[in-house]
Amino acid sequence: ILMIDDDMVFPQDIFERLYRHQVDVVAALAFTRNPPHLPVLYKQHEGWDPILRKAYSKMEWIVNYPKNKLVEVDAVGFGCVLIDMKVVRAITPPYCMTSSGTGEDIFFCVQAKQAGFKVFSDTSTVIGHLSNPMIIGQEQSEKYNDPKTMELLYGAYKKYGVYDVCLNSKAEAAVKNGSEQVEVLAK
């Protein structure tokens, strides 16, 4: 199954580019529409919360990724994804339902991984994401995201969560003003 969002710009040979890998799930590399235009790649992070005394699992952005490679990840955005039908047949419906605050793409990838399938991103196949007035791609992401800004932003995301950083003016100010502010706000 090839799924492509209606706000993506992709090459005419997108199917061939993804199909050549012959893997369970593979997505073209896309970036978020809104700044900071992060790559839509995720790694699952698991740990133990000593205060709540329970295990936790969450998806974290993969900010630094190998370029021009087929990269195994834990989840991808479904802006442009090719899924082998054996994956769909192996997963129990509902395929894309979640109440955890994550999107249907992450939910599906978690189910696929739990069923023993692998998820990949083809970072050599970069697609554009329509955003008024431009198309967001790797070039815009790299212009916007110098290494220090990415490190600060990623730290804020880890402390506040993606949704909170996008909507929380304190978190936004922390990212703009530097790492000391992020640390102060986190206390």
Predicted regions and their residues:
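Short beta-strand-to-loop acidic/aromatic patch adjacent to the donor-nucleotide binding site
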Residues: I1-V9
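Amphipathic coiled-coil/heptad-repeat helices and related helical stalk/stem segments
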Residues: F10-P11, D105
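Conserved catalytic core of nucleotide-sugar-dependent glycosyltransferases
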Residues: P11-M97
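C-terminal catalytic/acceptor-binding lobe
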Residues: M85-K86, A90-K187
